[in-house]
Design a protein with these regions (language model features):
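An N-terminal, well-structured beta->alpha segment
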Residues: 2-3, 8-106, 135
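N-terminal small/polar loop signature for handling phosphorylated ligands or for N-terminal nucleophile
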Residues: 90-138
């Protein structure tokens, strides 16, 4: 288990957070239960993907956790070699809150790792993403 207080302080001091995110974390200062619930450990990837409350924190759903999780996927793809990186990934978004921001963050991480990204420009149903995966040969 992480030292949640240390992790909270690390996030609070991070340049990666914008002013609103820092304010959100500053607002919970002194609320040990809330700090622990947000920082006791990383959000886990389950059978339905990443699921959590949209808040700032390591155990919450936010753009920083999306980037962190995507880096893990990027590492796996990169370990498979240049062919896997060239095949790349397909990313789409749905109508849920922050879906577009999360899709863009994931695309940025993949691209920064030299992985080809095909991202849909607008909302798409899951079967269309499944089709893209098959169509592009993944």
């Amino acid at each position: 288990m992480l030292d949640y207080k240390r992790e909270y302080e690390r996030w609070l001091a991070s340049d990666a957070l914008n002013a609103d995110e820092k304010a959100e974390l500053q607002a919970i200062a002194g609320d040990e239960k809330e700090i622990e619930s947000r920082f006791y450990g990383p959000l886990e990837f389950g059978t339905a993907g990443l699921r959590g409350t949209m808040k700032v924190g390591l155990h919450q759903m936010n753009v920083h956790v999306i980037r962190w999780a995507t880096q893990g996927f990027a590492d796996v793809i990169a370990a498979e070699g240049d062919e896997a990186k060239q095949k790349g990934v397909a990313i789409c978004m749905d109508c849920r809150v922050n879906s577009m921001a999360f899709a863009r963050a994931a695309a940025e991480v993949c691209a920064a790792n030299g992985i080809r990204v095909r991202i849909f420009e607008s909302l798409r149903p899951t079967p269309e993403l499944s089709f893209a995966v098959r169509y592009y040969g993944w």
